Amino acid sequence: MNILITGVAGLLGSRLADWIQKNTKHTVIGIDDMSGGYEENIPKGVKFYEENLSVDNLDSIFEEHKIDIIYHFAAYAAEGLSPFIRKYNYQNNLLASTNLINHAIKHDIQRFVFASSM
């Protein structure tokens, strides 16, 4: 199976990617815009795309890898700053998540797991 993990450079995404690679034969594809993650968190062997989820090039990623499952962990966590950057959070968290969900529907992905500490 091909598993897409958003936020793969963050805590949740990188830990899940590492576990999948160590315990299964599934392929991990990761997306992160690196606004809060760290490159060293991304396990070796992950096909990594440094992208924002609001861009329209998700189609090419979905088509190239024939995604089976999405784990959506990407979000901009701005502890204490959220009231001051509402527009950014709206675009980066809500609209980006909506874009990902729409791509999942378009590409008939049956499993979509969303987790957030926001």
Located regions from the model:
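N-terminal Rossmann-like NAD(P)+-binding domain of SDR-like oxidoreductases, especially those catalyzing
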Residues: 1-118
